[in-house]
């Protein structure tokens, strides 16, 4: 990596600030769930704070992200305000989806968070659709599809990458590989050492 490819100090500090916010919120989520204050499905992103932090500092406010049920940290990094996010998780009408989406379906278009989906692998074709719409409008927006390593083993992954390549879509695919697809270790479910090799 050349010197000019290195992020500047201000960018690094913003990544660190976002990662710290994600870590603090993850700790709070786990604390309130353990205490029984909130009863909800929650998939911790502990140890993955840098990924959405580094991605989000390189996006514009109106760029899109489509994330998965494990993506609360992606939404926070993109800029979803904490008060309506927490209200959503608590099922309150002041939430981002009026309390009807819950933790697995956070949406906040003002921050560019178009959908959080509970269906494994579905973030990729949805992000492609948003990217294609942006391309047709010529508005310069970029879409990001977050997904896990398990989703890289389903058809939607291959179809989405093929479509993005074919149409030269302004879309970025971000695999957050935590080493497990539910309970299956990465090496038992994927035949390549690096998911990026499939692209």
What are these regions (language model features)?
Residues 1-39, 61:
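Cofactor-/ligand-binding subdomain signature composed of acidic, glycine-rich
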Residues 27, 35-167, 185-191, 196-199:
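Cofactor-binding active-site loop characterized by glycine-rich and histidine/acidic residues
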Residues 6-9, 33-34, 138-141, 173-176:
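A short alpha-helix capping/helix-coil boundary motif
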Residues 13-14, 144-146, 180-181:
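A short, structure-level motif marking secondary-structure boundaries and short turns
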Residues 167-187:
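A short, conserved beta-to-alpha structural element at the edge of catalytic cores
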């Amino acid at each position: 990596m050349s010197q000019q490819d290195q992020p500047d100090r201000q960018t690094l500090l913003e990544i660190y600030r976002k990662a710290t916010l994600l870590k603090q919120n993850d700790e709070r989520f786990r604390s309130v769930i353990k205490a029984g204050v909130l009863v909800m499905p929650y998939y911790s992103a502990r140890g993955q704070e840098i990924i959405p932090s580094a991605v989000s500092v390189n996006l514009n406010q109106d760029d899109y992200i489509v994330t998965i049920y494990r993506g609360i940290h992606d939404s926070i990094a993109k800029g979803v305000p904490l008060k309506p996010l927490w209200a959503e998780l608590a099922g309150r009408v002041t939430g981002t989806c009026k309390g009807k989406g819950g933790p697995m379906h956070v949406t906040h278009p003002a921050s560019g968070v178009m959908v959080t989906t509970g269906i494994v692998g579905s973030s990729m074709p949805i992000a492609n659709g948003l990217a294609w719409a942006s391309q047709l409008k010529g508005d310069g927006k970029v879409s990001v599809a977050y997904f896990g390593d398990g989703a890289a083993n389903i058809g939607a992954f291959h179809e989405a990458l093929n479509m993005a390549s074919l149409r030269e879509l302004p879309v970025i695919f971000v695999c957050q590989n935590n080493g497990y697809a539910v309970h299956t270790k990465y090496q038992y479910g994927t035949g390549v050492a690096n998911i990026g090799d499939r692209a």
